[in-house]
């Protein structure tokens, strides 16, 4: 609810001068209006569990009569919307128009949660709209509406606070106690006393160890910065500042789930903090003795912090920078102090050759620039640690880099003692491949080839069996049938017989026909 935060602010701001004030809900009087008997009894029971004073009414007419008689004693009106609804809205209008009743906040409750009903109730002057079934934490914060309405109208505030701690709050085991109460009486001053004892003992140790330093601190510190302990320790160490920030004590009941969670999840003091504290004590003791040493013997305990490893984790990794120029090739080491302690000379990685990044006619640094001992280099540096570069194939159209010698930093090797694999290979005179034609030229060549192929096409009717066609052309056809050709010699020799028979039977005459192929 909106009023919960304001209620806490009121309760917290009222704690002045050692005494603490708490909300006394028994001073709040509520006028309950509900036409349903069962619902009215349930709401009445919840309000009584919250220690409110309740006056019941069954209709809007009874509410108006009670307000006309006891308007100054009613603090809150808790009414049902279905009285019916029309009479409920008339009651809201009547109370909003009456100047003597405007200071009473009206809280509506109903089983319905339609937006239209809620908006109309709020427009007619309702302070809040609650949906049944009501919850305990909603009813516990009803008194905040009274405080807000009076403050908004500029009226005098009612005293809802009680100085008596035991009368204001009940036992946490009771049924009428909820976790949303401002404070619980189960919180006593035991945790505060324990904290005060710890701080007082630590301050006492500091005062005993440095008695000469404590007096000027007290004299030079303004009164506003002095922190005095509470309870019985206030007189033991007055005016002594805490060596650490004050730990705020959250007052929560021991039976609450929050305290059980905090107890289970509170981490113990880490070993790293304890070791740092031990190291500070050792440094303080060494200052008093006047003995300063560069290293501290930490072999007595097995859990001491390795400062060297810690610095190694904290410092970022830095790499040597290799610089190139167009005139000469010079190597610059940006980190001189990051040498390995193992004794093996570091091998610095050279970048690959990129076309256009270095001049092909550059001068190479002589071998004498690298100072060192060839014997140490031969002992510590095997041949496998000397990589060879420029072994990757070069791009077409770019000449290879000429060979030059390179050595790890801190080594001086004669040219006759260098292995052959330490040389950059000379470029072989390989013929340059012809430049491939562009995409448009390839497309034009493909189109020309397609046109030539199209000209060679033949759209005539294809014959499947050529030999059969030739044989069919040589045979004569009569009415679609194949016939044999007649022999001319036989016809001439028997010409007379044929002429005689022609008159008698013309059908028996053999007719010579020459068929032409179709």
UniProtKB/Swiss-Prot annotation:
Q: Which domain of life is it from?
A: Eukaryota
Which residues belong to any copy of the CCT domain? 443-485
Indicate whether Membrane appears among the record's keywords. no
- What are the record's GO terms for cellular component? nucleus
Q: Where is the composition biased (Polar residues)?
A: 196-212
Which of UniProt's keywords are assigned here? Answer: Biological rhythms, Nucleus, Transcription, Transcription regulation, Two-component regulatory system
Q: Where is this region: Disordered?
A: 172-241, 266-305, 483-518
| Source organism | Oryza sativa subsp. japonica
* Response regulatory domain location: 29-147
Indicate where this protein resides in the cell.
Nucleus
The family assignment reads:
Belongs to the ARR-like family.
Q: Which gene is the coding source of this polypeptide chain?
A: PRR1
Q: What is this protein called?
A: Two-component response regulator-like PRR1
UniProt function note: Controls photoperiodic flowering response. Seems to be one of the component of the circadian clock. Expression of several members of the ARR-like family is controlled by circadian rhythm. The particular coordinated sequential expression of PRR73, PRR37, PRR95, PRR59 and PPR1 result to circadian waves that may be at the basis of the endogenous circadian clock.
Organism ancestry = Eukaryota, Viridiplantae, Streptophyta, Embryophyta, Tracheophyta
